[in-house]
């Protein structure tokens, strides 16, 4: 997948897009779970941790399929430091209007786009035999929004 985008000595945009989707979609799932009101998840560390778990599952699959984890700062995605950074970010977007601006407004107004992205990632993960039970659970909880 995306092999046509690889070029020598350059960042592969396909790798970046896979990694970006693996981070963004759990946030979209959270928006759909809360009907766009991320403040409902404020303080719900268990759910926010599941978002991070889903991201990590998918980064493993992306790496196992031979893709590079991008940006380079995220290559240590299984570390405690990565989890801590992600948790802080997710807490911030759930506790402030930043979540509405950065995540909710986009997810709630781009359901077709997020659904297509989810379908494409699902297909990719099935092709590479990814083990992603947390991702699948968050996907189910997104409910009626994903098509």
Regions found by a protein language model. Give the residues of each.
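Internal alpha-helical scaffold of NAD(P)-dependent oxidoreductase catalytic cores
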Residues: 1-70
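NAD(P)-dependent Rossmann-like dehydrogenase/reductase catalytic/cofactor-binding core
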Residues: 56, 63-147
């Amino acid at each position: 997948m995306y092999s046509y985008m690889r070029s020598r000595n350059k960042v592969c945009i396909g790798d970046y897009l896979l990694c970006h989707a693996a981070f963004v979609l759990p946030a979209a799932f959270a928006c759909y779970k809360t009907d766009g009101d991320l403040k409902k998840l404020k303080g719900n560390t268990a759910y926010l941790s599941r978002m991070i778990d889903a991201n990590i599952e998918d980064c493993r699959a992306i790496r196992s399929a031979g893709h590079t984890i991008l940006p380079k700062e995220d290559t240590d995605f299984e570390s405690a430091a990565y989890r801590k950074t992600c948790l802080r970010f997710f807490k911030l977007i759930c506790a402030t209007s930043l979540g509405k601006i950065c995540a909710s407004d986009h997810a709630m107004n781009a359901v077709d786009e997020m659904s297509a992205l989810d379908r494409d990632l699902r297909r990719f993960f099935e092709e590479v035999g990814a083990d992603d039970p947390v991702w699948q659970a968050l996907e189910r909880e997104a409910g009626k929004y994903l098509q």
